[in-house]
C-alpha cells in the first residue's frame, strides 16, 4: 500500500501501473473537501515513484463519484470570498498535478461521474466506462458553475457547442452519447472494465496510443476561429437567456466565463473560472437551490425510513377514470405496479384509457420506449365497471367527483369489496380525511393521497394522515407513491391539507388586490417576471378552473371562517357566474385558443374587464413591491401557521411541497427559505404595513417571536473552517 486515506487509497496494480481507488465509508463516493486533500496527499506519494509508468483511477462502489459533497456547500458558501478563492486554487492545483503526471492516466468509470466526479476524470487522459454511465456537470442547477476545472477542460476536449450544452443546462448524459461526442473513449461491460482499462494503459505506455497528444488540447486555448466563437457563444447566450432567465444567473455566467477563457491556456482559464465561481457561491440563488437539493434528500430519506419494513403494493386500483384517474393509472403501470381502473360509466373508462394511451404514445414518439414496451404497460391497466379482481388489490385510490357524499358512498362500497388489509385512499384536494373516514368500518386503513395535475409531470403527492389512519396505512401509501416515482410528503388532516390551505390565502390576496383596483394583467406579469412564479394568479386560476376554485374557496372559508370567509363578491364569483371557467371552456381571466400543437394559448379578452368592474373599485396602479407583498404575505403567514399547528412537520417539507406542488420559484427555495433570506424582522415590518387589510395579513405569534430576535427557521449554518485547515482536512 503506497497511501491510505479515509476515502481513497493508492497501491501498485502491476508492472509500474498504480491504482488510485476511491472507497469512502458508506454507500457512495463524494468529492468532499477531505477527499480533495487526500487526493493531494496521494499525489505527493505518487510523484516520488521513479518507476511509475501509468495511473488507473477507479472506484470500489456501485458508482464512481456521485459528485461533490453538497452537504458541505452551505458552510463553504459562507467562507469569505478570498478564502473560498484560495481553497479553489488549492483544489485545482491537485487536479492539475493529476493532469501533469509524467505518465498516462486513465479513469475506469462505473455508474455516476457527476459534478466534481466528472471534473476529476476530465483531468485524466483516458476515460473507459460501463454502459450504466451518467456523466455531466449539474452545477448550474445548484446556482453555481463548475469550480474544479470543468468549464476549462470540457470545452477544450469536446468543442464549445457540446460542452456549453452540458454545462449551461446542468445536464448529465449516458454512455452512448458521451462516446459519440468524445467525452469518453470506450464503453465496456462491467466485468471487463478493469482488464480493459489496464489494456488501454499498456497501449499508452508502449506508445501505441499517443497520450501526450490527448492531453495537450486541455492545456491550450480553445481552438475556435473568431466566427465560430461568435456563433457558438451568441447562440448559447440566446438560449440561456430564453430558458434560464434573469432569476438564474449561473448558466449565463458559465457561458460568459467559457467565452472569456477561450483564448487562454489552462492556468489563466482556471483563474477566470475561479473569479466567476466565488461570487456565484455567495448568491441567495445558490443558497436556495442547494437548500432545495438538501431538502429533497431529506424528504426522500424520510420516506425511505418510513417504508423500510413495508412491502410495496403489487396490485393497485383507481376509482374514477377520466383525466385524473387515467393519469394515476398510467403512472402506476408505467412504474411497474399493475392497476385496475373502475368507473360506473363506459365513456369515463374510455377517457381514462385514452389518457394513459396518449401519455404512452408520447414516450414512444420521443424514442424512450418501443411498441413492445407500450403494449406491455397498457396491458397492466384493466378498465372495469365492477369489482372483479378487487380481492387481489393492496391499495385503492378514489378519484371521483369532489363531493363528500359521493366520495363517502364510493369508499364505503369499495371497502365491502376488498380484503380487510387493503388500504383505501382518497385523492380529494380539500375535503378533510377524517370526515370521509366516518363512512368506513376500518378508518385505520384509510388516508388521503392528493395527486397534482398533470399527474405524470407533478412530482408531489400529499399523503394525509386522518385522525384514525394507522402508521402501516401511511407507510403503504408512501411506498406506492415512491414506487410511482413521486415525492410523498406526509401531512396532518385539515381542510385543504397543506398545499391548498396555503394556496387559497394567496388567491384571497389576489381577489383583494383586484377589488382595490389592480389590473390582473399587471399582477400576473409581476408575479411571473419579478417574483418568478411559472404562472401569475389569474393564469393559475384559469388552469385550475374557476369553477373548481369557486367550490374550493367555499370549502376553505367553511374550514377557516375567521381568515378565509369573505364579506364581498370577488372576481372569482363574477367569472363563475358568467360561466367563464378558465382553460376548460376557453374563457376565464384570459381567452384561450389552441396553437398549432393543440395547446391552449392565452390571449387578452376585453370582455372580462366589464365583468370585473362590477366587483372592483376604479382602476389604480400598484407598485411591483406592493403587489408582491400583498400576494405573498397571506400565503407565508398560512405556511407558518401550518408548521405551528403541526400540519406539516418541518420547514424542509413545507418548502419542498410548495416547490413540487405549486411551482414556488426554486431560486427562492420555498416560503421558509425566502423568509430566512429576507429576515423575519424585515418580513414583520413589511407585513405590518398591510395588517389593516384583515386577518390574512396578521402575522402568527410564533413568527413574531422569531422576528423579535431575527431568528431563522432553518438551523443556522457555520462557515467552513479556514482555508488552511480545508487543505489538510
UniProtKB/Swiss-Prot annotation:
Q: Per UniProt, what is one GO molecular function of this protein?
A: NAD+ binding
- Is NAD a UniProt keyword of this protein? yes
**List of catalytic residues:** 450
Gene Ontology BP terms:
fatty acid beta-oxidation
The metabolic or biological pathway listed in the UniProt record of this protein is:
Lipid metabolism; fatty acid beta-oxidation
- Which reaction(s) are listed as its catalytic activity? a (3S)-3-hydroxyacyl-CoA + NAD(+) = a 3-oxoacyl-CoA + NADH + H(+); a (3S)-3-hydroxyacyl-CoA = a (2E)-enoyl-CoA + H2O; a 4-saturated-(3S)-3-hydroxyacyl-CoA = a (3E)-enoyl-CoA + H2O; (3S)-3-hydroxybutanoyl-CoA = (3R)-3-hydroxybutanoyl-CoA
Record-annotated residues binding substrate?
Answer: 296, 500, 660
Region listing for 3-hydroxyacyl-CoA dehydrogenase, in residue ranges: 311-729
Q: Which UniProt keywords apply?
A: Fatty acid metabolism, Isomerase, Lipid degradation, Lipid metabolism, Lyase, Multifunctional enzyme, NAD, Oxidoreductase
Marked site positions, Important for catalytic activity: 119, 139
- Region Disordered: list its residue ranges: 708-729
EC numbers listed for it are: 4.2.1.17, 5.1.2.3, 5.3.3.8, 1.1.1.35
GO terms for cellular component = fatty acid beta-oxidation multienzyme complex
Region of interest called Enoyl-CoA hydratase/isomerase, as start-end residue ranges on this chain: 1-189
Under InterPro entries, the record lists: 3-OHacyl-CoA_DH_CS, 3-OHacyl-CoA_DH_NAD-bd, 3HC_DH_C, 6-PGluconate_DH-like_C_sf, ClpP/crotonase-like_dom_sf, Enoyl-CoA_hyd/isom_CS, Enoyl-CoA_hydra/iso, FA_oxidation_alpha_subunit
- Which residues of this UniProt protein bind NAD(+)? 324, 343, 400-402, 407, 429, 453
Describe the protein's quaternary organization and the partners it interacts with. Heterotetramer of two alpha chains (FadB) and two beta chains (FadA).
Briefly, what is this protein's role? Involved in the aerobic and anaerobic degradation of long-chain fatty acids via beta-oxidation cycle. Catalyzes the formation of 3-oxoacyl-CoA from enoyl-CoA via L-3-hydroxyacyl-CoA. It can also use D-3-hydroxyacyl-CoA and cis-3-enoyl-CoA as substrate.
Q: Which family does it belong to?
A: In the N-terminal section; belongs to the enoyl-CoA hydratase/isomerase family. In the C-terminal section; belongs to the 3-hydroxyacyl-CoA dehydrogenase family.
Query: What is the official name of this protein in its record?
Result: Fatty acid oxidation complex subunit alpha
Question: What's the gene?
Answer: fadB
Amino acid at each position: 500500500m503506497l497511501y491510505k486515506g479515509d476515502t481513497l487509497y493508492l497501491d501498485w496494480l502491476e508492472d509500474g501501473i498504480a491504482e488510485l481507488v476511491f472507497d469512502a465509508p458508506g454507500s457512495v463516493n463524494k468529492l468532499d473537501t477531505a477527499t480533495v486533500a487526500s487526493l493531494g496527499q496521494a499525489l505527493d506519494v505518487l510523484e516520488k515513484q521513479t518507476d511509475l509508468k501509468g495511473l488507473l483511477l477507479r472506484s470500489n462502489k456501485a458508482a464512481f463519484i456521485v459528485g461533490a459533497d453538497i452537504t458541505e456547500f452551505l458552510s463553504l458558501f459562507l467562507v469569505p470570498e478570498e478564502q473560498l478563492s484560495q481553497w479553489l486554487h488549492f483544489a485545482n492545483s491537485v487536479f492539475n498535478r493529476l493532469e501533469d503526471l509524467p505518465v498516462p492516466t486513465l479513469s475506469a468509470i462505473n455508474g455516476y461521474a457527476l459534478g466534481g466526479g466528472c471534473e476529476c476524470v476530465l483531468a485524466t487522459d483516458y476515460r473507459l466506462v460501463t454502459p450504466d454511465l451518467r456523466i455531466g456537470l449539474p452545477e448550474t442547477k445548484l446556482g453555481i458553475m463548475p469550480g474544479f476545472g470543468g468549464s476549462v477542460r470540457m470545452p477544450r476536449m469536446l468543442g464549445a457547442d457540446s460542452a456549453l450544452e452540458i454545462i449551461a443546462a446542468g445536464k448529465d448524459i449516458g454512455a452512448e452519447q458521451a462516446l459519440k461526442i468524445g467525452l469518453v473513449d470506450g464503453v465496456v461491460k462491467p466485468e471487463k472494465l478493469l482488464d480493459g482499462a489496464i489494456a488501454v494503459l499498456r497501449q499508452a505506455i508502449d506508445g501505441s496510443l499517443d497520450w501526450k497528444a490527448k492531453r495537450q488540447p486541455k492545456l491550450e486555448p480553445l481552438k475556435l476561429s473568431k466566427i465560430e466563437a461568435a456563433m457558438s457563444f451568441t447562440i448559447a447566450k440566446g438560449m440561456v437567456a430564453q430558458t434560464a432567465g434573469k432569476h438564474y444567473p449561473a448558466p449565463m455566467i458559465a457561458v460568459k466565463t467559457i467565452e472569456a477563457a477561450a483564448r487562454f491556456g489552462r492556468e489563466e482559464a482556471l483563474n477566470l473560472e475561479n473569479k466567476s465561481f466565488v461570487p456565484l457561491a455567495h448568491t441567495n440563488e445558490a443558497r436556495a437551490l442547494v437548500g432545495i437539493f438538501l431538502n429533497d434528500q431529506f424528504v426522500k430519506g424520510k420516506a425511505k425510513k418510513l417504508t423500510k419494513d413495508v412491502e410495496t403494493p403489487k396490485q393497485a386500483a383507481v376509482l374514477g377514470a377520466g383525466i385524473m384517474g387515467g393519469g394515476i393509472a398510467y403512472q402506476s403501470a408505467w412504474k411497474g405496479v399493475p392497476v385496475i381502473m373502475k368507473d360506473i360509466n363506459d365513456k369515463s373508462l374510455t377517457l381514462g384509457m385514452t389518457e394513459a394511451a396518449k401519455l404512452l404514445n408520447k414516450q414512444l414518439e420521443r424514442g424512450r420506449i418501443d411498441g413492445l414496451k407500450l403494449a406491455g404497460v397498457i396491458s397492466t391497466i384493466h378498465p372495469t365497471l365492477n369489482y372483479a379482481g378487487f380481492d387481489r388489490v393492496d391499495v385503492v385510490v378514489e378519484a371521483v367527483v369532489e363531493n363528500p357524499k359521493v366520495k363517502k358512498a364510493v369508499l364505503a362500497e369499495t371497502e365491502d369489496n376488498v380484503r380487510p388489509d387493503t388500504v383505501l385512499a382518497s385523492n380529494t384536494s380539500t375535503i378533510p380525511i377524517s370526515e370521509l373516514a366516518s363512512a368506513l368500518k376500518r378508518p385505520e386503513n384509510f388516508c388521503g393521497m392528493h395527486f397534482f395535475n398533470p399527474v405524470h409531470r407533478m412530482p408531489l403527492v400529499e399523503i394525509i394522515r386522518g385522525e384514525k389512519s394507522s402508521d402501516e396505512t401511511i407507510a403503504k401509501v408512501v411506498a406506492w407513491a415512491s414506487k410511482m416515482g413521486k415525492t410523498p410528503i406526509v401531512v396532518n388532516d385539515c381542510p385543504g391539507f397543506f398545499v391548498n390551505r396555503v394556496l387559497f390565502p394567496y388567491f384571497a390576496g389576489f381577489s383583494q388586490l383586484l377589488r382595490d383596483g389592480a389590473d390582473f394583467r399587471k399582477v400576473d406579469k409581476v408575479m411571473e417576471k419579478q417574483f418568478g412564479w411559472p404562472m401569475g394568479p389569474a393564469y393559475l386560476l384559469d388552469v385550475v378552473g374557476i369553477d373548481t376554485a369557486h367550490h374550493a374557496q367555499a370549502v376553505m372559508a367553511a374550514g377557516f371562517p375567521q381568515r378565509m370567509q369573505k364579506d364581498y363578491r370577488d372576481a372569482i364569483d363574477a367569472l363563475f357566474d358568467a360561466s367563464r371557467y378558465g382553460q376548460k371552456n376557453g374563457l376565464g381571466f384570459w381567452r384561450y385558443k389552441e396553437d398549432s400543437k393543440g395547446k391552449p394559448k392565452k390571449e387578452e379578452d376585453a370582455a372580462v374587464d366589464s365583468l370585473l368592474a362590477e366587483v372592483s373599485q376604479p382602476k389604480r396602479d400598484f407598485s411591483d413591491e406592493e403587489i408582491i407583498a400583498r400576494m405573498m404575505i397571506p400565503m407565508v403567514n398560512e405556511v407558518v401557521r401550518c408548521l405551528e399547528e403541526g400540519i406539516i412537520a418541518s420547514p424542509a417539507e413545507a418548502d419542498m411541497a410548495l416547490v413540487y406542488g405549486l411551482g414556488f420559484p426554486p431560486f427562492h427555495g420555498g416560503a421558509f427559505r425566502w423568509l430566512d433570506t429576507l429576515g423575519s424582522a424585515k418580513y414583520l415590518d413589511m407585513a405590518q404595513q398591510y395588517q389593516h387589510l384583515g386577518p390574512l395579513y396578521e402575522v402568527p405569534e410564533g413568527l413574531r417571536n422569531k422576528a423579535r430576535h431575527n431568528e431563522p427557521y432553518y438551523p443556522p449554518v457555520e462557515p467552513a473552517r479556514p482555508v488552511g485547515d480545508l487543505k489538510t482536512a
